[in-house]
Every structure is written in structure tokens, then in C-alpha cells.
Amino acid sequence: MKNILFMTHLDDKFIDGALVMIYSMKKNVKDFMEYPMKILHSSAISDLSVENREKIKKLVPHVEFEDIYNQSYMDAPVQYPKHRVAFLSLECFRPTEYEKVFFFDCDMLCIRDISEGIETAPNEYVSGCGGSIDDINCGLMVIG
């Protein structure tokens, strides 16, 4: 396995997009199956069913799932409770056993190989796409 973790968060509402995104990465990212992958979900906020986990495992048999429980995410004020699942993206900063973490949202499509950009992103920074000089779009980040 390569030492760059592919990571996302997911619940049942976004399974169709996730399956398309993962399939598109599998098709376009060089050596995709050599990257470890972890999918975060939260049974306390918005769960990912066993059935949907199995659908993902058919695409990426080595995928790991982690059920996150963090009381802060449940207590934080939000306009719409369904948006609490977005707090799980903060968990992509926790893994320290990898050289980098590539965090992606499941509402995207990979249309060409992005591995060079991931592998050459600076190790000492968080690289994102979009945004401005003051902020980034947190839907795609490489954490070094």
C-alpha cells in the first residue's frame, strides 16, 4: 500500500454520489487500488448502512469504515441538523501514520489522473482547491 490515505465522510443520503466518485477515481487515478481508503460515518448523526458499506467494498475491497462519535459535533449549533455530517471532515486531520491524507467530498467526479498532484503536494501544508487567498474549498484537500 502507498502511504497516502484517501479519506471521505459519508452517510446514506450521498451513497449514489460516493459510488460514482469512487468508481471515477478507480478508473482514472493511477494505482488507485494501492492507496489505503477510509470512509467516516456517524451512527449518532447520520449513519451509513451495512448494505451501502457493502456496495463500496465491491469497488474497493480494502476500504476501512470508522464510526465517529464526537459530542461536540452533536452539540454545535447548526441551522439544519442534516449538515452536522460535515463536521466529520475535521477528522481528516487526525491520522498521523500516513505521509499525507487526501480528503475528498463525494459530490465530485474524477475525470483524469490526479495522483501526481496528490503525491507532489507539499508535506508541510494543507493544499486545497478553489477558494481564495484567505480560504479554500474544503471539499478537496491534501493534508501533508
Language model feature labels by segment:
Residues 1-144:
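Glycosyltransferase catalytic domains, chiefly GT-A lineage
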